[in-house]
């Protein structure tokens, strides 16, 4: 069956269609070819894609309008009552998200572990098909790793009405997957966030899966992880961490727009790192290494922004930021804790467990293709199974949507148990 829908029209239904929502795209038509069962191919006859359409840069006003309050649901005591990683603390059904009627949402708070080994509470949301029976074995799971949002509690995607990527994630729910979207520790919950730290975020992703299964028993045991930007680094870090865990249910990782380390991501942010991003980076380093002295990195002028970082999200920005050049002290990158932080976030040092699909756009200013190639070369050299899909003339905002067909095909192949394809040099 093929639907032709004018772009800008939201389709909401609890009927038979596996697509209950389509993203708001500008111009042209969206043609969705659907087959009975799991298989679906999406053909987009427009140049604008999911990432651009659903997360426009509308500034502080837009972020405020989409924000949800931080409720007592997210509050946890310090220290936490003892719990194993992945153990569910609490859950609640939540109906205030801007999601299609075909999607049910359940918020979760669960035990995870910080970089220092501390038991930390982490929040997230589980999205499942509404009113449908799961297949035998339960809903196949896509663990979603989100991109950079900031370090404030309010920057948690589960505290945004569109869950950060609502139309994109809803598409997968309507294809028959459950989506488990962690916030990362410290976003939502009252702990420090390890900004841009792949190993910490990967731990939160891995622990979100059993917690989600405890909250929503219809979830199956098999899962993949997919992430974009900071979440791409996280998805690859999950693959590396799984080398030591070897969860038989884990089937692979998709890294979109960021198959590289924290140092390269911050250095190659569009038009250079923003002042707030540098403040957030210092915050993340301090979270991973508590003995790190922020004043060894940041100037006196930057400290006010650093202390305000817990109140500001990257999207909303700050009214009076010092320039990036005024933020940092000369030679800050040679600080021992900064170097250790960047080194622990350098991909391709630990062999990945399971296949990786890397997706990037050659026009990506934030994640330079040559740096991605260097990371993939390291990973391939150590025997990782990497499939790299490059899209000419696409930037991060469009590559996440324009690569949907490849994403779906790769995910279907993993759950079907078909062999992986690699194109390592």
Named regions from a protein language model:
Residues 51-133:
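Catalytic-loop region of hydrolases
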Residues 58-71, 78, 256-349:
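Accessory cap/linker subdomain of secreted extracellular hydrolases
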Residues 137-147:
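Short beta-strand element of the alpha/beta-hydrolase
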Residues 146, 169-188:
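Conserved alpha/beta-hydrolase
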Residues 195-215:
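Alpha/beta-hydrolase active-site loop
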Residues 211-216, 220-275:
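Primarily recognizes the serine-hydrolase "nucleophile elbow" in alpha/beta-hydrolase
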């Amino acid at each position: 069956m093929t639907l032709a829908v004018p772009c800008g029209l939201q389709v909401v239904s609890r009927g038979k269609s596996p697509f209950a929502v389509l993203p708001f795209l500008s111009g042209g038509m969206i043609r969705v070819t659907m087959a009975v069962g799991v298989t679906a191919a999406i053909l987009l006859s427009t140049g604008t894609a999911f990432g651009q359409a659903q997360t426009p840069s509308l500034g502080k006003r837009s972020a405020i309008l989409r924000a949800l309050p931080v409720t007592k649901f997210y509050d946890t005591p310090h220290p936490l009552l003892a719990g194993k990683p992945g153990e569910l603390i609490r859950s609640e059904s939540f109906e205030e998200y801007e999601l299609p009627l075909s999607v049910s949402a359940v918020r979760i708070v669960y035990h995870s572990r910080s970089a220092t080994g501390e038991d930390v509470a982490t929040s997230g949301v589980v999205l499942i098909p509404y009113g449908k029976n799961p297949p035998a074995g339960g809903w196949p799971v896509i663990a979603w790793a989100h991109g950079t949002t900031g370090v404030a509690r309010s920057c948690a995607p589960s505290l945004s009405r569109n869950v950060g990527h609502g139309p994109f994630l809803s598409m997968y729910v309507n294809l028959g997957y459950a989506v488990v979207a962690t916030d990362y520790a410290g976003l939502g919950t009252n702990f420090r966030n390890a900004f841009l730290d792949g190993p910490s975020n990967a731990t939160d992703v891995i622990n979100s899966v059993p917690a989600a299964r405890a909250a929503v028993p219809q979830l199956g045991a098999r899962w993949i992880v997919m992430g974009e930007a900071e979440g791409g680094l996280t998805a690859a870090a999950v693959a590396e961490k799984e080398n030591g865990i070897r969860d038989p249910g884990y089937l692979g990782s998709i890294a979109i727009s960021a198959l590289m380390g924290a140092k390269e991501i911050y250095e190659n942010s569009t038009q250079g790192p923003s002042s707030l991003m540098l403040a957030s980076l210092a915050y993340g380093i301090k979270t991973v290494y508590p003995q790190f002295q922020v004043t060894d990195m940041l100037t006196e002028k930057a400290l006010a922004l650093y202390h305000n970082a817990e109140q500001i999200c990257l999207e909303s920005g700050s009214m009076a930021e010092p320039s990036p050049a005024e933020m940092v002290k000369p030679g800050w990158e040679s600080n021992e804790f900064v170097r250790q932080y960047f080194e622990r976030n350098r991909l391709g040092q630990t062999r990945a467990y399971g296949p990786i699909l890397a997706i990037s756009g050659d026009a990506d200013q934030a994640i330079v293709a040559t740096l991605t190639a260097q990371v993939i070369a390291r990973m391939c050299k150590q025997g990782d199974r990497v499939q790299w899909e490059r899209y000419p003339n696409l930037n991060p905002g469009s590559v996440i949507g324009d690569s949907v067909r490849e994403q779906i095909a790769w995910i279907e192949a993993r759950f079907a148990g078909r062999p992986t394809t690699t194109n390592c040099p």
